[in-house]
Design a protein with these regions (language model features):
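Glycine-rich phosphate/pyrophosphate-handling loop used in enzymes and phosphotransfer proteins
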Residues: 1-223, 228
């Protein structure tokens, strides 16, 4: 990234820092410094997106076609700083750059072929107001910059937020997000019978984007809405 003169002045007045190591970023670096980016514990889910540890979370539960993750997350590891920064330190640009990195990996293996659009996992309204943005939507924006896929934020909404998923086991995670999502009231699947009807999502393939996938509970609940149009 080559900075303009104005951007360089802004960078001097308000320097940018790597969310992983905390070192100051130089003008050619994005949100994550070159060194930390190099050592991110990337997954190998790209090698077989139809048969990997993430995809297997959803086998026999929903008709998922493929799944991938950019890197492994472990609490108190250096990568945990990334999630902390984008969730609690108002760093939406970190999420966007992660989306770009993810999309660049996926483009190498044609992961996005046959995908019609992106649906970021929505936050509860009060959570989004507190945070100022939805980190999953910011990741989706980064993916869209590379793939040019449209982002849909008006199809699904989160109507319930009970408790944070952090520190919960698999069963409690599943219980915590039951009935947490719904289609927007304006969405009427019964009015979208025609295959070519403008705006219809029936029969289309969507990429669901979340920032962290631990047990797949949130994604599973999101994908089992009371309509087959999202599956």
């Amino acid at each position: 990234m080559r900075l303009s003169i104005l951007a360089k002045i802004i960078d001097m007045l308000s320097p940018r820092y790597c969310p992983v190591c905390g070192n100051r970023l130089n003008g050619e670096e994005e949100s994550i410094c070159v060194s930390c980016n190099l050592f991110l514990p990337r997954t190998d889910t790209w090698k077989d997106p139809y048969n990997n540890e993430m995809a297997k979370m959803f086998w026999h539960r929903i008709p998922i076609e493929k799944a991938c993750a950019l890197f492994y997350y472990k609490g108190h590891a250096f990568t945990s700083n990334i999630l902390y920064q984008l969730k609690y330190s108002h760093r939406p640009e970190v999420a966007t750059d992660l989306g770009i990195l993810l999309a660049q990996e996926g483009m190498k293996v044609h992961f996005f072929d046959d995908i019609d659009g992106i649906i970021p996992i929505p936050l509860a309204p009060h959570r989004q107001r507190q945070r100022g943005y939805n980190q999953s939507e910011e990741i989706a924006k980064g993916i869209a910059q590379v793939t040019h896929l449209p982002i849909y934020t008006n199809i699904v909404r989160r109507n319930v937020f009970k408790e944070s998923q952090t520190q919960k086991d698999r069963w409690r995670r599943n219980e915590n997000v039951k009935e947490a999502f719904e289609l927007y009231p304006s969405y009427r699947p019964d009015q979208e019978k025609g295959k070519n009807k403008s705006g219809s999502i029936a029969g289309r393939h969507f990429l669901m984007v979340d920032d962290v996938c631990t047990t797949g509970a949130v994604s599973y609940t999101h994908l089992t809405l009371p309509t087959s149009d999202l599956v």
